[in-house]
Amino acid sequence: MALVLSYGSAHAEDSPQWLTYPGGEGPGKGKHIVLITADQEYRSEQSMPMMAKILSKHHGFNCTVLFGVNEKGEVDPTMIVHPEKGREVKEHHIPGLEQLASADLVIFVTRLLTLPMAEREMIVKYIDSGKPFIALRTANHGFNTDLPYKINGKQVNWGREILGGDFMGHHGRWHADSTRGTVVPELKDHPIVRGVSDIWGNSDVYRTYKEGTSLPAGCTALVWGQPLMGRNPDDAPNTELEPLPVAWFKNWQTSEGKSARVFQCTMGSGTDLQSAGLRRLIINAGYWGMGMESDITATRSVDIVGTYKPLESGFNYAELGVVPKPVSAYK
């Protein structure tokens, strides 16, 4: 079955294939943030509309949420990313990527996507533009195939080179540990962590570099993630596991020598984002990325707009109640 794509203009408009949230008053008035949700484990199809509502209502940004969809045009976190017995991997699609042309910031929450070349090219055009972007949780292994992105004839690696960290495994017990985030003391006055406190999420810590090494040159760690012994915020730390960076920033030098501000946070599951501290960290990073540090305050609201009840993370879709749904179900 062919997927029928109905794209709009470069300006975000209402569509049955993506969500738009017009900005109100606030420092973000007139600026456009695009949030891309296309993962299969961490319920970003719920969390990114929630974040878009906060950014539009409390901060004034125009927001567009783009979804990974199946061949029927449904938001489908159950699509496989590796061949399974009796099932082949089908291409993912993200309708509305033309909206990147008007974006001032993009937030990626993707995981092992197999995208058509035309869609990958639109993503590359943005990340090579010099504009800022944020990568959350699984976005550091966001694509199953290389992006068509070379600089001086050399293939560019999305996770390791652009973001500053690839997924190299779970640092602790997958779906059993949780993460306590603490701001790096030397960076306590950085604008991204202004007003940030009490970072906790029930996802585990990712390792993004080999043991005995560190973040790549040019990356500045902002938040350490300490694995806890359970999935409650007051659980004891796992003293056998060192804390690892879970949030950092860097600059990406594009093919034309432009410098894009990049922020990666390996926390960011749907349930992690119930933490106001984590939400503020990510929202502050957006301001920083767009060069709006002077507009970051410790008190501007990051409160959830309406109701937010994310499903638990995981691949046991039937048990969790994860099924394909129309985009409108996430408004």
Task: Go through each PLM region and give its residues.
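Bacterial N-terminal signal peptides
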Residues: 1-7
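Catalytic beta-strand/loop cores that center a nucleophilic Ser/Cys/Thr
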Residues: 15-18, 56, 62, 91, ...
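Oxidoreductase and adenylate-handling cofactor-binding alpha/beta cores
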Residues: 159-167, 185, 199-205, 211-217, ...
